[in-house]
Amino acid sequence: SSLVIGVTSLGDIKKVGRIGVKTVAYYLVTTAFAIVIGLAIGTIMQPGVGLHMAADTAKVAAKAAPPISKVIIDIFPTNPLEAMVKANMRQIIVCSLFVGTGITVVGEKANALKHTIDGLAEVSYKIVGMIMAVAPIGVFGLITPVVASNGPAVLLPLLKVVIAVYLACLLHAVFVYGSMIKFLAGMSFIKFIKGIAPASLMAFSSCSSGGTLPLTMSCAQKLGASKEVSSFVLPLGATINMDGTAAYQGVCALFIAQLYGIDLTASQYMTIIVTGTLASIGTAGVPGAGFIMLTMILTSLGLPLEGSALIAGIDRILDMPRTSVNITGDAAVTLLVDKSEKKHAEAEAPLY
């Protein structure tokens, strides 16, 4: 409902296209940067070097990177209701874009439908606000079993991987988002971090970009983003923007290569960057999606899939920072696009 309202609020189909192009471009560029940072940290820290651990012999199902034609075809729903029941975010987004565009084209005759959808969006925001009142209890409940089930026996041998992923996510947030916010959005990075903190914490504990979306939207609007832009950019980001996950891909791909004593070539490094960026578009923002993307990259590199079984044991711990960075990136891009649109509106304003 929020995306439909976002499209109808923009009011101009050309404006929807302009914002859409800018949004996707920002998301793809930041994702590529994140993978490069992950590769750099993996190269410097070398988390797999000297780790003498037998890989789990259990078979790990290979996930080949989908061809671009399949990615495009799969985003169009054959049954919108089925897409909503199965929480297929890509198809829901496309369906919402069509509905929003249709309402905009029809105009006044569709106002009743527009108001109904707007009401649904407001109700969902209110429900999220009520949930946030007891969120600290929920956060504690979500994190406790993760810590309890991943004790020292599991964590210590892979501690270097955990540190590398957390460090890559932190560096990406500070340097990439920090530069974007300061120089392109014209905002203090400290102010931005304080404003997005509630959503980042919720994403950290829930490991779901989609589940955190209403709260992310609220935080972005409090930071100054318009409702029309945030309602369009953020739902899109929850599906295709996975910067934290991309940083994780870079670290973990190198970890597995180092674990097996395999030296990657320059072309293989480029394969990681390209495959990881494209896979982020075709993977929904749900818990564990990053692990599916990792198997795609390992398959494209010809690395042993058994190595991913080692990562699976600590994947939940690695999922927390990457999801937090994912939604932080969504908010950063929202502020950038909003700033750009405000400048565009000022440039087109008539002079008297």
Label for each model-derived stretch:
Residues S9-K15, G50, V106-N111, G119, ...:
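Juxtamembrane helix-boundary/capping and inter-helix hinge elements in multi-pass membrane proteins
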Residues G50, G250-Y352:
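Transmembrane alpha-helical segments and their short flanking loops
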Residues T23-L28, F98, V162, Y166, ...:
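Transmembrane helix-bundle signature of multi-pass membrane transporters/permeases
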Residues P198-S280, T334, E346-Y352:
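Helix-loop-helix junctions within the multi-pass membrane cores of secondary transporters/permeases
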Residues G11-K14, K22-K191, L351-Y352:
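Signature of multi-pass transmembrane helix bundles
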Residues G17, P152-K160, G186-A197, I262-T271, ...:
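Membrane-water interface of transmembrane alpha-helices in multipass transporters/channels
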Residues S1-I5, L39, T43, L97-T101, ...:
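Transmembrane alpha-helix boundary and packing residues in multipass membrane permease domains
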